[in-house]
Amino acid sequence: PIGYNQSIVYIKSKNPLTGDDRRFRYDTVPKCYGLMASEELEETGILKVRRSPQLGYRGSGTLIGIIDTGIRLEESLFLYEDGSSKVVSLWDQSDQSGIRPEGFLYGTEWTREEISEGIKKKDKKLPGDENGHGTFLAAVAAGREDIDKGFSGIAPDAELVVVKLKQSKKYLREFYSIPDGIWSCQEDDVMLAVRYVISVANKLGRPVSICLGIGTNLGGHNGANGLARYISYLSLLPKISFHIAGGNEGISGHHFHGIIRREEQYQTVDFNVAEGENGFIMELWGDEPNVYTVGILSPGGENIERMQLKMGEFRSIRFFPENTLLEIRSFPGATIGGSQVIRMNFKNLVPGIWKLFIYGTGNGEK
């Protein structure tokens, strides 16, 4: 248990996770998250607020939690004049060689004193940031002022609690068709990272703002998944706030929203598969009490007519001559916030325009 009606369970299994795996409900398999940083800082207006002499908000006495790819601790933006670090505590989930944080089962914890000493000695064991995404977010949030370079973080006097997330496990990367070389973390590690940051803030007796610059295409975006529920509970507590990426994929074409009206038989969604795309998962979320079914047309012209899937039913379909495999499963809405979900897992995809036909039945229009 990690609190607030949320628990994480680890199960040792030799069997890979598949689309037909009936051991787990939809909402019990961790989702994978990717990086979502945006550099449009001036557009938020936050720098003007921070610069206002009447307000003078600089973050003194507060903490900012960075849960991301890590941080380049040796950067001057994160060091005081005496060489000590602005990072009061760091949990490296990817390193199993050191002392774990109290109450956690993996990773290595670094205190401010250990970090500062490691920087002075140029200790190669210090956690880093191979990607740079977490360092960027930390600099924007709490980087110290550099007058010569004209730079300042939003809250330059705030201090940092950092979690370097470990990357998603192999079985999840395979299940979600995440290519090699693409950074990805998993939902349960993020939830534990949030718990860690808050535990540090509580020990120090300081308010904390937690920055999550990660996101996922999966889920209903309705606040019903594990991480969203956990954040919703915690955000009601005093001295805890969250800053979360949203809207970063507004023009990327990864989402579709539609209404099937009573006079319509179905709606068509075109999705373009690029060269080199080996596979992906697509989800259809529908509002109850309506029931939704789908059909699919491949670029080669093979038409899979309307599939009447029962709740919980799984089907495996092979497209010829493309040799694409589609694993499709319908999930009942009772377990995931009142929405029907149809999950489509495409493997060995061929490029071109695919068509998804969405049928709705019921008294409503959505």
List each model region and its residues.
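Subtilisin-like serine protease catalytic core
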Residues: 52-186, 206, 289-290
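Generic recognition of flexible, low-complexity loop/linker segments
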Residues: 51-54, 126, 148-151, 230-231, ...
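Surface-exposed loop/edge segments in extracytoplasmic proteins
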Residues: 302-308
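Substrate-binding/access-modulating region of protease and related hydrolase catalytic domains
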Residues: 169-259, 277-291, 297-300, 320, ...
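Autoinhibitory propeptides
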Residues: 1-63, 70-86, 344, 348-354, ...
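Glycine-rich, phosphate-binding/catalytic loops in enzymes
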Residues: 80-86, 228, 260-262
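Solvent-exposed, conformationally flexible loop/turn segments
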Residues: 252, 256-268, 272-277, 310-315
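Short strand-edge motifs at loop-to-beta-strand transitions and within beta-strands
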Residues: 7, 267-269, 340-342
